[in-house]
A protein has these predicted regions:
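Acidic, PIN/NYN-like endoribonuclease modules and their adjacent C-terminal/linker elements
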Residues: 1, 85, 98-129
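Short, well-structured N-terminal submotif of metal-dependent ribonuclease cores
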Residues: 1-35, 50-60, 121-129
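Short beta-strand scaffold positions
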Residues: 4, 35, 73, 92-95, ...
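Alpha-helix capping/helix-boundary segments
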Residues: 8, 39, 78, 96-97, ...
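Short active-site oxyanion
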Residues: 30-32, 70, 102-106
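Acidic catalytic patch
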Residues: 37-40, 59-87
């Protein structure tokens, strides 16, 4: 199994550097790949900040990536829940934080808009401080 860094994921998803994209494709084809949640978070940030991806495009790209047969991801259930939450307008980082909390734990934030979006998405135990 090979764990990958954000730049490998971004090269695979964007293909913006032909040589590195080819190397990333070969790596992903060669065997099992492990992706940490932090790599997914940083990939989302890079795709938004440097490549102009919106939340839907980030969700679609990461969903395709995680659908590859040889890709394993840290805390797959939380990542899947986070990607689903982004459909409700919650950004990837907030969705990942919310979906990664222990079962039954409250989640609090000063961000009024986030709390409202989370509640509209059906998340329970979310409150504003």
């Amino acid at each position: 199994m090979t764990a990958v860094d954000t730049n490998v994921v971004v090269r695979l998803l964007t293909g913006d550097d032909a040589k590195q994209a080819a190397a990333a494709r070969a790596l992903f084809a060669a065997g099992p790949i492990w992706i940490a949640k932090t790599v997914l978070l940083e990939s989302g940030w890079v795709l938004r900040s440097l490549y102009g991806f919106d939340t839907g495009a980030i969700r679609d790209a990461l969903t395709r990536l995680l659908g590859l047969k040889n890709v394993r991801v840290e805390d797959a259930a939380a990542v899947a829940a986070a990607l689903t939450l982004t459909q409700s307008g919650i950004d990837l980082a907030d969705a990942m934080h919310l979906s990664s909390r222990p079962v039954g734990a409250r989640f609090v934030s000063f961000d009024k808009a986030f709390v409202a979006r989370a509640k509209r998405a059906g998340a329970s135990g979310v409150a504003r401080v």
